Amino acid sequence: MKFSQAVQDFERYLLLDMNRSANTIQSYRRDLAKFQAYLTEQGIDNVEAIDELTVRAFLAKLSQASYAASSTSRMLSSLKQFFLFLRKEGILETNPMSLVHRPKQGRHLPKVLTAREIEALLQAPDTSSPHGLRDRAIFELMYATGLRVTELVQLKLEDLHLELGFIQTLGKGDKERLVPLIDEAIEWLEAYLEQVRPSFLRLAGSPSPQEVFLTERGKAFTRQGIWKNLNKYVALAGIKQNVSPHMLRHSFATHLLENGADLRMVQELLGHADISTTQIYTHISTQRLQEVYRKYFPRA
């Protein structure tokens, strides 16, 4: 079977049989496209011609290109699922991934913003302008909920339950979760919905977009748009380090734990399937505790 046909069948399986989200399928597609580019270089067109040595040579090439261990691990996961599917469907007699294992990943502590930096960032947008009011609502919501940027741009009007003080979102693995909101985030969100979104919506086509956050042309906001705006406000706020949207999520979790939140509660708020993923934030809090201790204890 041609590799391209096998990928199409795999994507159909993910969508129809496994009910995977469009973002999940797109991630698989990106990884398999990289693998296919390598196969093309090697003159391999059919999945039957792929063996363990082919896979290992591909992974070695990624390593030589300084591919991050986490990215290699994700690539391995994609390839494992792909070849498991081909084996299950009887397209392959053997699985070339059966003896290929994940690389060990070093522990990297996520970077976070201080409470003062968060406040400076939230104050940066000019809320007297429509764009500034929208952006203030976006960053207030991201920090108050720990939403992933993908979850934010996919948030629909029907997901807002502001009168009850929470939103619902669809996270990784299509897991739905409820996230409470503080009053200040609700106030900024309501101000955007009442004062800005209707004017942006006038330029939208039909049917009207249901996404909460829109561009001035009435289009749903994109991940790239969030990144671009964030970089602008980071500069305005005088924050010296590079800041990504995910750092707001890291900061949300870390600040909760620093102020005494229960680890299990933070796990639920973040939508982590495994609490070990959440435990990384306890290491950040411990590290910062040690920094404060060394700075202020007279004999440290």
Segments the model singles out, each with a brief description of its role:
Residues 1-300:
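Conserved catalytic core of the tyrosine transesterase superfamily
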